[in-house]
Amino acid sequence: SAESAGPQEDRDQVTGIIDAVNELMAAGPGDILVFLPGERDIRDTEAALVDHLGPRHVADGRARVPGAVEVVPLYSRLSAAEQHRVFEAHSCRRIVLATNVAETSLTVPGIRYVIDPGLARISRYSNRTKVQRLPIEPVSRASADQRAGRCGRVADGIAIRLYSEADYLARPEYTEPEILRTSLASVILQMAALGLGAVEDFPFLDPPDPRAVRDGITLLTEIGAIDRPSDGARRGPNGRSARGGR
């Protein structure tokens, strides 16, 4: 089941997470998955939880003290060995602090409870500034539902959203497709290399903004990756369109 925060949804995120952790630990045994927008949020929350847990915190997943809790971070910049910690056996409760890599990319085993502040870093390209950014934004309803679905796979679970039901209902149903919000330079270059023809004529499920296509072609032309902005590239004798060696 998913619960939403009431009038205190604007309170400090870390405080809200700690309060939710206390509530879920009182609800029964089981591991907790907390979704956070980025590495810094994870590190700040990890430090706060370790301080809050005090002597109950253990670093190796072994229940040497009553009510022992392990806190495990999970984000893409961690080494493969560090990311693999979430799959290792443990004998105490575990709190996993993860980016949205745990939303769809992998399944963290043993999760019974989820805490969702409702935020994520969403890649966006600005047609005005020509810069790719990673702003923190509210997730869509579909993403929120996906997150809530990560709990209760081993037993009846609880998902706590740190935002109101009205906030949830006001969010877009789905996350905007990536092709509509990121730089198309790499897509255009790959299409040219594969000889797929003009980008403007390709039958995308979600056709990109013509301005984004022009920006991508202009960038690739300026750095010499393709030859002609008119059709994306000049075809060589081998039928390939992009410059570059093997």
What feature does the model see in each segment?
Residues 1-246:
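P-loop NTPase motor module signature
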